[in-house]
Amino acid sequence: MKSSLHWFLISSSLALPLSLNFSAFAAVVEINLGPTNSFSGPGTYTPPAQTTNADGTIYNLTGDVSITNAGSPTALTASCFKETTGNLSFQGHGYQFLLQNIDAGANCTFTNTAANKLLSFSGFSYLSLIQTTNATTGTGAIKSTGACSIQSNYSCYFGQNFSNDNGGALQGSSISLSLNPNLTFAKNKATQKGGALYSTGGITINNTLNSASFSENTAANNGGAIYTEASSFISSNKAISFINNSVTATSATGGAIYCSSTSAPKPVLTLSDNGELNFIGNTAITSGGAIYTDNLVLSSGGPTLFKNNSAIDTAAPLGGAIAIADSGSLSLSALGGDITFEGNTVVKGASSSQTTTRNSINIGNTNAKIVQLRASQGNTIYFYDPITTSITAALSDALNLNGPDLAGNPAYQGTIVFSGEKLSEAEAAEADNLKSTIQQPLTLAGGQLSLKSGVTLVAKSFSQSPGSTLLMDAGTTLETADGITINNLVLNVDSLKETKKATLKATQASQTVTLSGSLSLVDPSGNVYEDVSWNNPQVFSCLTLTADDPANIHITDLAADPLEKNPIHWGYQGNWALSWQEDTATKSKAATLTWTKTGYNPNPERRGTLVANTLWGSFVDVRSIQQLVATKVRQSQETRGIWCEGISNFFHKDSTKINKGFRHISAGYVVGATTTLASDNLITAAFCQLFGKDRDHFINKNRASAYAASLHLQHLATLSSPSLLRYLPGSESEQPVLFDAQISYIYSKNTMKTYYTQAPKGESSWYNDGCALELASSLPHTALSHEGLFHAYFPFIKVEASYIHQDSFKERNTTLVRSFDSGDLINVSVPIGITFERFSRNERASYEATVIYVADVYRKNPDCTTALLINNTSWKTTGTNLSRQAGIGRAGIFYAFSPNLEVTSNLSMEIRGSSRSYNADLGGKFQF
C-alpha cells in the first residue's frame, strides 16, 4: 500500500514487470521495481541480474516492494542486488522497500564492488532491512567498496543484520545518513568491527528531523554501533541516542562509537548541535564505554546525557563514558543545553572479584589534553563521575575553564560542576569515586566552577579571572602541585558542618595559596535558614588553606567580614563573623565562621495570609445574605409568606507585592418568612447555609461550611417633602419613606490544607463568626411615565457595619507546626444608590436595575500573630487591604405566577481597585 507520508513525489509511471529503460541522452541504466517484484518465501527466489554499467544503475520503485524469506530453505548464491562497475542507486519515489529474513549465504543483500562508486538509497517512505543476512556467514546488509549514502527517506530501520567481518548493517569507504526523519539501527552484529556501521573513511549522520537510534548493536572488536578511522560528524539531529551497544572481545574499545586511526592526521569526532543526545548503558572492554576516539569535539544543542556506560577490564579499564586516546584532545561545550555525566563506571578485575569505580572521562597519555571545557550562560556541565588521566607528568598547556573562543572575546558565563551528590553512601566512602584529575594549569576565565558533595579536583595550578566564581561545599578540596590564586571564593552555607571544611592545598615546595577579595556565603536552595538550628549561635570551622609553609599562605587582601550573596532571605536572620587561626604543625591557616541570630523573616509558605483573608470571605457571605433579604422584602407584593432562594458568591482579589491574591467561592440556600407586626411594620427572618472554598495564588486551600441568620425590620412612614425634593419626578407633598434595619449573624467552620514544597502537608481547623448591622432609608417614587424605560425609582442611603472574628488555632500533621492567634475584621461603609423599576402591563412582572456607590469610612484590616511552635518565633500575618471605594451594579427580575406564588432572581457585581465580586440568587415565595 502506498504510504500517506511522501518524502518525494511519486513517479507517474505504472507498476511494470522488471524492465529496462535506456535514455537516449545518457548511458545510465534505469530499472523499475514494483509490487510484481515482491516475493514471500519459502520457495525459489531469483535475484535481479547483476549489473555492470560503468555509468551507473538506478532502481526506481513504482510501488511498494516486499521481499521476505528469500533464501529459504536454500541459501541464495548471490546478493539480491549487485553492481560491479558503476554507481548503484535505489530511488523510492515515496514507496516502501521492505526486506526481511534474507539468507544470501556469505553475500550481502546489497553490494557495490566498484571502486570509488556510490551505493545510495533515497526517497523511500519506509526502508526496512531486518535480518537480511545469514546468521553465521553473512557479511552485512549493505556493502559498498565506495561511498554509501542513505538520504531523504522518511523512515529507515536496520535490525538484526549480521556480518562475519565488519559492519553488520552498512559498510562503505564513507557513509552518509542525511535528511532521514526517522532512523533506527537495532541489534545488528559484526564479528569484527562496527556492529551497525563500518567505514575506514568518514561517517556523517546529520539533519535527522525526528529521531535517530542505535540500540543493542554489537561488535567483537571496536565500535559496538559505529566504527570509523576518519573524521566524522554527528550533527544537527533533532534527537539521537546510543543505548546498550557493546563490544565483546578482549581489548575491544568504543562501546558505541570508535573513531581512531594509527596514521596521521588523527581523526576528529564531532558531535554538535543535536537537539537531544543520549549515550546510555553502552559497554566496552578496556576503554571508552560509550566513545573511544583520538579527538572529540562535543558541542551541545540540547540536553546531552552520558549515563550508566561502563568500561570493563581485568587490569586497567579506562573511560567509563569517554576515552581519549594517547596524544588526543577533548573539547566540551554546553552551548544549547546541559551536558551530564552520571552513573558511568570502570569495572576492574576478574568476574569473581571486580571493583566498580565511577568514571566519566579518561584522558590518554603522551600529551593528551583537554582544550575546551565551557558552558554558555544558563547551561551547565555536570560531572557526577570523576575525570581521570593516564598522564603522570603535568602538561604546560593551560586549560581556560569557560574560556573565550578567541583572545579578547568575552568569556563564557555558564557553570561547570564536579559533584558527588549522585553517589550512594558506599560509593561516597571510596576516594576514587570523588577525585578528578586534570594534569594541566587551570584558569577560571568566567562563569562558575562548583565543587560539591565531597569531591576533590586535582590540577597543576589554579587561578581565577575577575568576575568568575569558585563555589565550594564544605568537605571539598582543590589541590594543585603549583600555586593557587583565588579572588572570589563562595562557600555553600547548606554544606557547613562542624567536622567538614573546604580545602585549598598546594603540595609542592615554595608554592603559594593566595585568597583575596571577599569570602562569600550563598544559600543555593533558598531554604537553608529555615532550619531551626539557626535559632541558636553557630560556629563552623569552614575553610583550610595549606602550603609547605604558613608564610606561603596569603590572606592579607581578604576582606575581614564575610559577604552574604543573598542577604535578603527567608527564615532566620543573623550576622556572620570571620576569624583565622594559624597551625604551624599542619602548615595551614583555618577560617572559622560564627553565626549570631538577629531575627526571623517567614517564608511566604509559612505566612498564612489565607487565614486572615477568610475573614473577607465571611464578610462577603454575610453582606450578600443581607442584600438578598433586603431585596426580597422590597420585591414582595404581599406582606406575608415564606420563601426560599439559592445563592452563590464569587470574590477575587488580585495579587500585590505584599499579599498573595486569593479567591472565595460559596453557594447555598436561604429560607425566610415575612409578616406584618402592625399596619406599617414588616418583619422578615431568614436562615442560610453556605458551602465555600478559599484558595490563594500559592499553596493554601480552605473549605468552609457557614450558617447564618438574619432579622429584618421595615417601617413605612409619611413625611412632608422638602421643597427641593418636590421637583423630582413622581414627588408628592406627602412623601412615603421606608426605614429598614437588619442584623445578621454568621458562623463559619474552616478546614485548610497547606501544601508545603519542602515539608509534609499541613492541616488546620478553626471557626470564624461575626455579625453585620444595616440601617437604610429610601424614598419610593412610582409616578414616572409608563412610556419610559422605567416606571419607578428608589433613591436610598445606608449605613453598614460588619464585625468578623477569627478564632485562634494550631496547625497539625506537619514538621514545623504553626499557631495562629485570633484576629478581627471591622468594616463600616456608607452605600448611596438608586434603584429603577419597570412593571409589566398587568404588573405581574417587574424588572429593576440598581447602581450604588460605596465608601468604606472605617476599617480594621484582618491580621493575627503567627508563630512557629518549635522555637516560638512569631510574626504578624496580615490579610489583604481592599480598596476603600466600590461601585456596585445590580439587576433583578420578579414574576408572580399567581397571587400566592412569586419567583425572583438577582445578579450583582461589585468592582474595587484590585478586586471584584459577583453574586447571583434564584428562588420563590409562597404567600398566604
From Swiss-Prot:
Point out the signal peptide segment. Answer: 1-26
Stored Gene3D superfamilies: Autotransporter beta-domain (2.40.128.130)
**UniProt keyword list:** Cell outer membrane, Cell wall, Membrane, Secreted, Signal, Transmembrane, Transmembrane beta strand
**Would the keyword Phosphoprotein turn up in this protein's UniProt record?**
no
Q: Which GO terms describe its cellular component?
A: cell outer membrane; extracellular region
Q: Where in the cell is it found?
A: Secreted, Cell wall; Cell outer membrane
How does this protein sit in the membrane? Answer: Peripheral membrane protein
A Pfam family annotated for this UniProt entry: Chlam_PMP
- Please report the stretch or stretches of sequence annotated as the Autotransporter domain: 635-928
InterPro entries assigned: Autotransporte_beta, Autotransporte_beta_dom_sf, Polymorphic_membr_middle, POMP_repeat
Q: Which residues cross the membrane?
A: none
Main localisation, per the record? secreted
Question: Which family does the entry's similarity section mention?
Answer: Belongs to the PMP outer membrane protein family.
Q: What is this protein called?
A: Probable outer membrane protein pmp9
Recorded source organism is: Chlamydia pneumoniae
Upper classification of the organism:
Bacteria, Pseudomonadati, Chlamydiota, Chlamydiia, Chlamydiales
